[in-house]
UniProtKB/Swiss-Prot annotation:
Residues 904-916, 980-1012 have a biased composition (Polar residues). Residues 758-799, 1013-1023, 1068-1091 have a biased composition (Basic and acidic residues). GO terms for biological process: synaptic membrane adhesion. The chain crosses the membrane at residues 712-729. This is Neural cell adhesion molecule 1. Its main location: membrane. Heparin binds at residues 152-156, 161-165. It comes from Gallus gallus (Chicken).
Length: 1091
């Protein structure tokens, strides 16, 4: 017990100690092996502490800054203990002690438990096993508490399969007895600790290796040596992993690297290719397949055969009638070849003997001999030795020469006649070659006494050419041949030929218009061939014989001839004679027959010729007897034999002798029936059958009528087409747009004005003619009926290629465009309203000025006929698509319009011809200057007083007849306008070819004259310039073309008729004042002059 005095102090310190509070957060901890964790020691209170210390489970104080177990003083009131990468030995009670000067020591503890998580210590993947072995899948699991192990395969517990082959061993390994390839896959080793609810698993790949199995595709292979061929030895192997293949020959490994020229392998080594097989390659070859599970091999025996080859032959020479000679032939090959002999005329088998025993053949092993006894000259020639076995054969020729004396052959008797050249042939057989001579009566030929004889020699014959002049040339001729073995002579007789005897007529088969004569050949030909047969016939009672010659070759084939051109129901006599080179022979006895009455024709004769394509045929129809009536046609029917339907019947005119049947079925039999028909009826059908060719897989090039073009030819053609296209485009640009290469050449080399020079030409007064063209002008007058937007009050439209240029200041419904294209003045009257237009001067003359021509139209006072005037019936028909329009009534008020003369060049020839009113309204008319002046004067008067009556003309044209009114479209396409070029005619031509004014008025549209077009003038022919003058003038003025004729005005004109006349011509010196121009016209001219 404590003393009483110490008790108060003890209570004091206990009270102080009790006042200190030390806590460790967390208060307890569990750490798995390998993990890290920290603990915080905290002190509650405001006193200052001297120290905060940590002690390990074994009582040792933990020092700061250790590597694995670290202690760190955070501040005056806390400290941290950190355990890194914990292990089992770190488990225990850790103590935190707090020391204070004022209050003493206080402490707190924490129990640190360290456990081992589930770990797979030994569970390799993959694990491989051999098929059929007992496999044990290893899986070692490490844990603080004993785990429960479960094996799964394909997501299921293997023990639930109830397969006795699967067993979990005591060490938790999985055993599979007699493992199969189907057992291969992924197995999961899964460990569980129930106390902690911990689970972990490891997937193990199980591979089952299968030992290789190998088999040879052919256990025995045959090959042929010395053919530069290759042989392939092949083995097929299975197994897992894929086995590797190696080869041996008679136990020795084959390496491709050692002899690449002899051996090669495919990509997996399963095929061995032996190149250029020879006899040394015959051996036993083994293919070996090997993998992880084992190896296996297969054997292939290669047997090499040799094609026969002739190794020895020898040419021989013998004398005729010599005792014997032997020909020898040796050959090699495997199997041993058999040897046969043959000549050019026969085959000689082994052990064969001729009937007379002259030829003997003996064979032994690889040698054969041919023995000839009592040699004859016919034994000479080529002997072929052939060695053959199951692999092939080989042949070699040897030659036997037999020397013998000459032997002569040839026809002994030769026929000819005086003057006919003939050859006497002396064929000579001799070895060595013989010298041939001809003799006549012991005299060597040729000689001076026989100038009509020539000799021609060849190596095998001699020909004596004789042209008999008289009886003396006929007789015996001797041929003699000599060589070093001997000589031979032969006599030949030249006999004078005679005409043939008569043929005999056996039977005559008459028809309506023909007769078929059967005959026998003459008994004697006269020594020379019969060339023709002459048939003669006449009707009973006629004195003259009709005759015809028939070729002997054709007549002798069937022994018949056919006489044609006979009359029905008429009795005839016929006789025959043969013709040879000597002449016509004896005539046979006549044979009488009577032709049949008119009837249906005989069936024609058919011949076929297959086409090159194989499925077409040309059937020739050969006419036979027509039955006394001309054949009208042939009826042709055909079909394939396997088909029940006939093709459509073909009617062939009698003048055509064949028909082509095309697009027939391939490899099919066809039958054709042809019937001839005349007025009396139809003949019996003629039948012809044929078969088409089999359908070719590839059509041969020869069937094509033309050979294919090569690549170079095709490229060349394309280049030519491209160049031609460029030329065409350039020419088009030249004529239409005045541009392109041709235009550049014309401008730079020929001095032609370019497109940019048009305005300049206008300013210089060059208008519409080039340097070398005529100075005679042409004025083209055209009637326009299309109303432009400007005249209709619509929006102004810019001119383009498809819209005409218009003149906005005129309000007239009908106007005519006047273009002065050359300095000559041309104009005329029209039954339309007043024609008006303003042009600038187009002359280079320094005195040229702007002139206004005014034309007015009024009814004539009197109609004065003119001899040159055209009647209405002579009017040219209206253009296609144009509607006739009636001229205006005579009471119409004349309208005045100024015309501009583009030339001040005078002309002395006044107009003499009266022009039809359609000329001016339809096309340009040629007028004299007097007429133009008269029109100008009238225009002037009209400008002063518009109501003044016009001056009547001296000459009038008869009124145009009225024509029915037709609706006309006021819109034209550029194509239609281009298709209707205006034409300028001379007065003479206009009088000859007047145009219909109403149809022209209805046609409407502005038509430009064709460029470079030839025009007939009174003084000759000239070409218009290749530029559009109207377009250039209005381009310079900055205005559009005159207004077109409105459709309404055209209909108004169509409802009335009127006469038109040419105003009286003023004096030649009379001028038209320019001051009478309207204000708008004056403004346009000033504008043009300023430019």
């Amino acid at each position: 017990m404590l003393p009483a005095a110490a008790l108060p102090w003890t209570l004091f310190f206990l009270g102080a100690a009790a006042s200190l509070q030390v806590d460790i957060v967390p208060s307890q901890g569990e750490i798995s092996v390998g993990e890290s964790k920290f603990f915080l020691c905290q002190v509650a209170g405001e006193a200052k502490y001297k120290d905060i210390s940590w002690f390990s489970p074994n009582g040792e104080k933990l020092t700061p800054n250790q590597q694995r177990i670290s202690v760190v003083r955070n501040d005056d009131f806390s400290s941290t203990l950190t355990i890194y990468n914990a292990n089992i030995d770190d488990a225990g009670i850790y103590k935190c002690v707090v020391s204070s000067v004022e209050e003493g020591d206080s402490e707190a503890t924490v129990n640190v438990k360290i456990f081992q998580k589930l770990m797979f210590k030994n569970a390799p993947t993959p694990q491989e096993f051999k098929e059929g072995d007992d496999a044990v899948i290893v899986c070692d699991v490490v844990s603080s508490l004993p785990p429960t192990i479960i094996w799964k395969h394909k997501g299921r517990d293997v023990m639930l399969k109830k397969d006795v082959r699967f067993i979990v061993l005591s060490n938790n390994y999985l055993q599979i007895r007699g493992i199969k390839k189907t057992d291969e896959g992924t197995y999961r080793c899964e460990g569980r600790i129930l106390a902690r609810g911990e689970i972990n698993f490891k997937d193990i790949q199980v591979i089952v290796n299968v030992p290789p199995s190998v088999r040879a595709r052919q256990s025995t292979m045959n090959a042929t040596a010395n053919l530069s061929q290759s042989v392939t030895l092949a083995c097929d192997a299975d197994g897992f992993p894929e086995p590797t293949m190696t080869w041996t020959k008679d136990g020795e490994p084959i390496e491709q690297e050692d002899n690449e020229e002899k051996y090669s392998f495919n990509y997996d080594g399963s095929e061995l290719i032996i190149k250029k097989v020879d006899k040394s390659d015959e051996a036993e070859y083994i293919c070996i397949a090997e993998n992880k599970a084992g190896e296996q091999d297969a054997t292939i025996h290669l047997k090499v055969f040799a094609k026969p080859k002739i190794t020895y032959v020898e040419n021989k020479t013998a004398m005729e009638l010599e005792d014997q000679i032997t020909l020898t032939c040796e050959a090699s090959g495997d199997p041993i070849p058999s040897i046969t002999w043959k000549t050019s005329t026969r085959n000689i088998s082994n052990e064969e003997k001729t009937l007379d025993g002259r030829i003997v053949v003996r064979s032994h092993a690889r040698v054969s001999s041919l023995t000839l006894k009592e040699i004859q000259y016919t034994d000479a020639g080529e002997y072929v030795c052939t060695a053959s076995n199951t692999i092939g054969q080989d042949s070699q020729a040897m030659y036997l020469e037999v020397q013998y004396a000459p032997k002569l052959q040839g026809p002994v008797a030769v026929y000819t006649w005086e003057g006919n050249q003939v050859n006497i042939t002396c064929e000579v057989f001799a070895y060595p070659s013989a010298v041939i001579s001809w003799f006549r009566d012991g005299q060597l030929l040729p000689s001076s006494n026989y100038s009509n004889i020539k000799i021609y020699n060849t190596p095998s014959a001699s020909y004596l050419e004789v042209t008999p002049d008289s009886e003396n040339d006929f007789g015996n001729y001797n041929c003699t041949a000599v060589n070093r073995i001997g000589q031979e002579s032969s006599e030949f007789i030249l006999v004078q030929a005679d005409t043939p005897s008569s043929p005999s007529i056996d039977r005559v088969e008459p028809y309506s218009s023909t007769a078929r004569v059967e005959f026998d050949e003459p008994e004697a030909t006269g020594g020379v061939p019969i060339l023709k047969y002459k048939a003669e016939w006449r009707a009973l009672g006629e004195g003259e014989w009709h005759s015809r010659l028939y070729d002997a070759k054709e007549a002798n084939v069937e022994g018949t001839i056919t006489i044609s051109g006979l009359k029905p129901e008429t009795t005839y006599s016929v006789r025959l004679s043969a013709v040879n080179g000597k002449g016509v022979g004896e005539i046979s006895l006549p044979s009488d027959f009577k032709t049949q009455p008119v009837r249906e024709p005989s069936a024609p004769k058919l011949e076929g010729q297959m086409g090159e394509d194989g499925n077409s045929i040309k059937v020739n129809v050969i006419k036979q007897d027509d039955g006394g009536s001309p054949i009208r046609h042939y009826l042709i029917k055909y079909k394939a034999k396997h088909s029940s339907e006939w093709k459509p019947e073909i009617r062939l005119p009698s003048g055509i002798d064949h028909v082509m049947l095309k697009s027939l079925d391939w490899n099919a039999e066809y039958e054709v029936y042809v019937i001839a028909e005349n007025q009396q009826g139809k003949s019996k059908p003629a039948h012809y059958a044929f078969r088409t060719s089999a359908q070719p897989t590839v059509i041969p090039a020869s069937t094509s009528p033309t050979s294919g073009l090569g690549t170079a030819a095709i490229v060349g053609i394309l280049i030519v087409i491209f160049v031609l296209l460029l030329v065409a485009v350039d020419v088009t640009c030249y004529f239409l747009n005045k541009c392109g290469l041709l235009m550049c050449i014309a401008v730079n080399l020929c001095g032609k004005s370019g497109p940019g020079a048009k305005g300049k030409d206008m300013e210089e007064g060059k208008a519409a003619f080039s340097k070398d063209e005529s100075k005679e002008p042409i004025v083209e007058v055209r009637t326009e009926e299309e109303r432009t937007p400007n005249h209709d009050g619509g929006k102004h439209t810019e001119p383009n290629e498809t819209t005409p240029l218009t003149e906005p200041e005129h309000t007239a419904d009908t106007a005519a465009t006047v273009e002065d294209m050359l300095p000559s003045v041309t104009t005329g009257t029209t039954n339309s309203d007043t024609i008006t237009e303003t042009f600038a001067t187009a002359q280079n003359s320094p005195t040229s000025e702007t002139t206004t021509l005014t034309s007015s139209i009024a009814p004539p006072a009197t109609a004065i006929p003119d001899s040159n005037a055209m009647s209405p019936g002579q009017a040219t028909p209206a253009k296609a698509g144009a509607s006739p329009v009636s001229p205006p009534p005579p009471s119409s008020t004349p309208k005045v319009a100024p015309l501009v003369d583009l030339s001040d060049t005078p002309s002395s020839a006044p107009a003499t011809n009266n022009l039809s009113s359609s000329v001016l309204s339809n096309q340009g008319a040629v007028l004299s200057p007097s007429t133009v002046a008269n029109m100008a004067e009238t225009s002037k008067a009209a400008a002063g007083n518009k109501s003044a009556a016009p001056t009547p003309a001296n000459l009038t044209s008869p009124p145009a007849p009225s024509e029915p009114k037709q609706e006309v479209s006021s819109t034209k396409s550029p194509e239609k306008e281009a298709a209707q070029p205006s034409t300028v005619k001379s007065p003479t031509e206009t009088a000859k070819n007047p145009s219909n004014p109403k149809s022209e008025a209805a046609s409407g549209g502005t038509t430009n004259p064709s460029q470079n077009e030839d025009f007939k003038m009174d003084e000759g022919t000239f070409k218009t310039p290749d530029i559009d003058l109207a377009k250039d003038v209005f381009a310079a003025l900055g205005t559009t073309t005159p207004a077109s004729v409105a459709s309404g005005q055209a209909r108004e004109l169509a409802s009335s008729t009127a006469d038109s006349s040419v105003p009286a011509a003023p004096a030649k010196t009379e001028k038209t004042p320019v001051e009478d121009k309207s204000e708008v016209q004056a403004t346009e001219i000033r504008h043009l002059q300023q430019k």
